[in-house]
From Swiss-Prot:
Keywords: Early protein. This is Protein fil. InterPro entries: Fil. The gene is fil. This protein causes filamentation. It comes from the Viruses. It comes from Escherichia phage 186. It holds the Pfam family Phage_186_Fil.
Length: 75
């Protein structure tokens, strides 16, 4: 029943070029441990949504709307 061949998972671990600590932890280039889920919060802090357009842009759109009489408004 038991085979003398190694398991598929052990072959994958042996082929991994980076040192690992188990449970998803990976050794970084500087030797420190790194986990992808742990650093996501830091990455998300750096992301920002689109900055709102200035009020000057809105005033120009309103004036243009009043002067031209636009049938439909986009955006």
């Amino acid at each position: 029943m038991l085979k003398s061949e190694p398991s598929f998972a052990s072959l994958l671990v042996k082929q991994s070029p980076g040192m690992h600590y188990g449970h998803g932890w990976i050794a970084g280039k500087d030797g420190k441990r790194w986990h992808p889920c742990r650093s996501q919060s830091e990455l998300l802090k750096g992301l920002k949504t689109k900055s709102p357009k200035s009020s000057g842009f809105l005033i120009i759109r309103i004036v243009h709307f009043v002067i031209k009489g636009v049938k439909h408004v986009t955006r």
